[in-house]
């Protein structure tokens, strides 16, 4: 039921895979889903994908998040661990997509790849 509601609010969900772990990821492909993101959410159980996004903010967030910024080929260019609320990540060069996810779900290393299925 939870993922049905997530799909209704945000859009389609897939799997984000890194090394041998995976988590559900929702493609935020509507204006509302991109605007809301994880704002006002306490319990984060999935990841969010923002295509064509090279900057984010954490205003109005209730919990910390991890942020992965990738190029078009899903190479990890930037990784922000345990990003707290009321922060801004200014635009980064060569970033094509941004992924927000629960804190410490993956042990991310720069210059590796994520897979989205």
Predicted features and spans:
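Compact, glycine-rich, soluble single-domain proteins
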Residues: 5, 9-117
